[in-house]
Amino acid sequence: MYKKISMNDKEIEHAINNEVDRQNEHIELIASENYVSEDVLTAVGSVLTNKYGEGYPGKRYYGGCENVDVVETLAIERLKKLFGVKFANVQPYSGSVANAAALATLASQGDKIMGLDLASGGHLTHGYKISFSGIFYNSITYSVNEDGILDYEAIKELAIKEKPKVIICGYSAYSRIVDFKKFREIADACGAKLMADIAHIAGLIAGGVHPSPVPYADIITSTTHKTLRGARGAIIMTNDVEIAKKMNRWVFPGYQGGPLFHAIAGKAVAFGEALKPEYAAYAKSVVYNAREFSNYFIKQGVSIVSGGTDNHLFTINVNKSYGISGLQAEKILGKFNITVNKNTVPFDELSPAVTSGIRIGTAAMSSRKFAKWKELGAIMHEILQNCVEFSENESKHLDRIAELKKQVEALTTEFPIITKY
C-alpha cells in the first residue's frame, strides 16, 4: 500500500493523503493509469527537480549537469534495450508533446495526416479538429468497421486516394492487435511515413505479448505511465539516423526547454524494472485478465466493442446494454469506489462529454495481482443494471448499496497496492 506523507503545507498534505486513500481503497480500471513503484516515486521526488539543463547529455547549455547526464543516458540506453531501437529521446513532458514533435519531424504545417477518428478509438493528437494536430495539419480520418475492427483494405484504399504525408497507427481505445506490418504496406503504397503511437500498449510490447512496430514504423511515440508503469511523461524512438536528428531538434528547442530530470529519473527506473524477467509475466497477466474480465460481461449479454479484447482494455457499450450513458456509468461506479472513464464507441450518437461507453483497463489492478475478475464483474453488472434506481431511489436500496460497497472494500483489502517490482 502507498503510505501517507507529512508536510509543513497541511492543505497540500491533506489533498495528497486523500489521494493516497483513494488509490488504496478504489478499484482502478482506467486503462491509462497504473501504480508506480516506491523507487519511481523516490526518483520523481528527488533533488533532480532542482536542476536545469537545456540540451542533451554532453551538450548542455548549463553547467553542473554531470549527474543528470548520467541519469538521462541511463534512461536512453535502457529504453533502447527495452524496445530494440537505435535512437531514443526521453525528454518529452507528455504524450501530446511527443506526438507534436514526431509529426513535425515527418511533416510540415498544412500537410495531410491520417489517423483513426476519435469515436473509433483514436486520440485527440491524431488529427482531432480541436487539437494542434487538426489545426496545424490537414487531417483526414479512417475508422473501424461495424464490428469495431480495423479494415486494412478500406484504410489502404483511403490512403491511396488521399495520399497523406503521415499515417498514424496506435490508439487510445482499440482492443485488438494492431498489424504494424500491414500499416507499413499501406504507407508504402501511398508514399507516406508511418508513425506508431504505442502509448497504451508499450508495456505489452516490452513484455512480448503484442507485436512491435520497431521493424515497420519510421517513428514511434509513447507515454511512460500506462502499461509501462513509469513516471508520467513520454518518449520518441526511431531507427533512422536522419529522423533521430530531426526529432531531437523538435523536442529541444522546438517544443520544450529544460528537461524534467526528476521525471526522466523516474522513467529510467521504470525501464529498468521492465527489463526484469518478472515484467514479462506481468504483461502476460494484463492481457489474460482483460480477456477474463471482458468474457464475463460477454456471457451476460453485454455489448463489448469489437466483441472482446487482445490487449489490456475493452469498451462496454453501456447505452446499448444498460440504457444509460457513459457519464452515468462512470458516476455510479465511482460511488462504489470503482474508477472507470466514459468513452465514445464507434459511430457514437452521444457527445464526447456524455458518450455511450465506458473504457475498462486491467493494467493497474494486474499490478496489484488482482485475481477476482468474475466477482468484480458481477458487482459492476448489478450496479450498472440498477444505475437509475440506485441514483434516483437510493433510500430504498440502502442495505444493498452498503453490501456492494462492502464487497468492493473487501476486494481492495485482499489485493493491496504493491510498491516493489
Curated annotation (Swiss-Prot):
Domain of life: Bacteria
Subcellular location, principal: cytoplasm
Protein's UniProt keywords contain Coiled coil: no
Coiled-coil features, chain-numbered ranges: none
Record's keyword terms, sorted: Amino-acid biosynthesis, Cytoplasm, One-carbon metabolism, Pyridoxal phosphate, Transferase
Gene Ontology MF terms in the entry: glycine hydroxymethyltransferase activity; pyridoxal phosphate binding
GO biological process: glycine biosynthetic process from serine; tetrahydrofolate interconversion
GO CC terms, sorted: cytosol
Documented EC number(s): 2.1.2.1
Gene3D superfamilies named among the record's database cross-references: Aspartate Aminotransferase, domain 1, Type I PLP-dependent aspartate aminotransferase-like (Major domain)
Reactions catalysed, as given in the entry: (6R)-5,10-methylene-5,6,7,8-tetrahydrofolate + glycine + H2O = (6S)-5,6,7,8-tetrahydrofolate + L-serine
Cofactor(s) required for function per UniProt: pyridoxal 5'-phosphate
Function: Catalyzes the reversible interconversion of serine and glycine with tetrahydrofolate (THF) serving as the one-carbon carrier. This reaction serves as the major source of one-carbon groups required for the biosynthesis of purines, thymidylate, methionine, and other important biomolecules. Also exhibits THF-independent aldolase activity toward beta-hydroxyamino acids, producing glycine and aldehydes, via a retro-aldol mechanism.
Name by which UniProt lists this protein: Serine hydroxymethyltransferase
Lineage, top ranks: Bacteria, Bacillati, Mycoplasmatota, Mycoplasmoidales, Metamycoplasmataceae
Gene that this sequence comes from: glyA
